[in-house]
Amino acid sequence: MHAISQIRLTFNQDRPDHEHDDDGSAGIAVQEAKPALQAPPMYKVVLFNDDYTPMDFVVEVLEVFFNLNRELATKVMLAVHTEGRAVCGVFTRDIAETKAMQVNQYARESQHPLLCEIEKDG
């Protein structure tokens, strides 16, 4: 397309009735569009307490699906146990939905009633 622009400019330069700016741009004003970028909405992945899922299983889930180290996974597991729920992480919607689905599927396959859901952050 650059070659076509040069051909047009050359053609327009040959026309006596066409005025040009000093830079040879033939009076064409160009404004760059700057898109207004916004951060995507974020979602919390929340684990809920139940009376049947072993604490070790919850720690394993936090290590495997949320990449938490043993110490942090244990702290989150204790928060789930004592407060009834805890946030495992905050992600974009697609990632949060995928993680919650993976945790719920793994819990069902392991025959545990552990529940994981997402909530809009903020």
UniProtKB/Swiss-Prot annotation:
Domain of life assignment: Bacteria
GO biological process, one term: proteolysis
Gene3D superfamilies tied to this protein: 3.30.1390.10
SUPFAM superfamilies given in the database record: ClpS-like (SSF54736)
One family name in Pfam for this protein: ClpS
Assembly behavior: Binds to the N-terminal domain of the chaperone ClpA.
Biological role: Involved in the modulation of the specificity of the ClpAP-mediated ATP-dependent protein degradation.
Family, as annotated: Belongs to the ClpS family.
Name assigned to this protein: ATP-dependent Clp protease adapter protein ClpS
Phylogenetic placement of the source organism: Bacteria, Pseudomonadati, Pseudomonadota, Gammaproteobacteria, Pseudomonadales
Gene: clpS
